[in-house]
Amino acid sequence: MSKRILYIEDNPENRLLMRRVLMAEGYTVEEASDGNSGLRKASESPPDLILMDINLPEIDGYEVTARLKQLPNMAGVPIIAVTANVMKGDREKTLAAGCDGYIQKPIDIDLLPSQIESFLKKE
């Protein structure tokens, strides 16, 4: 059975690209376009991994992460920030907020599958 990944991203082009890459690698992909819908989808049916933009409408990725980490059914589900926030200290802030990993935009499509696999192996 393929691993299920939830991708929370407000940009439709980014969602399309990520979906294509992940599906080509054999993953089942679910999507959410904002923080609230991502929170709802993840809490109703926890995925194997969450990839999430930080700058989301409604509630940002930091808040989504904090709320998900409080849910018992989300224990062990890696939350990976996929973000263009690349200023000094952004990576540390993201990890301190509870994200389990950090992938910088623009995404390196060739490197992405091995990054995802490494996060899935940690669970």
Question: What is each of the regions a protein language model found here?
Answer:
Residues 9:
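Conserved acidic carboxylate
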Residues 31-49:
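Acidic, metal-coordinating helix/loop segments flanking the phosphotransfer/catalytic sites
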Residues 53, 83:
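Active-site residues of response regulator receiver
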Residues 12-30:
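Two-component/phosphorelay signaling modules centered on CheY-like receiver
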Residues 16, 107-116:
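C-terminal output helix
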Residues 57, 75, 87, 106:
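The feature encodes the CheY-like receiver
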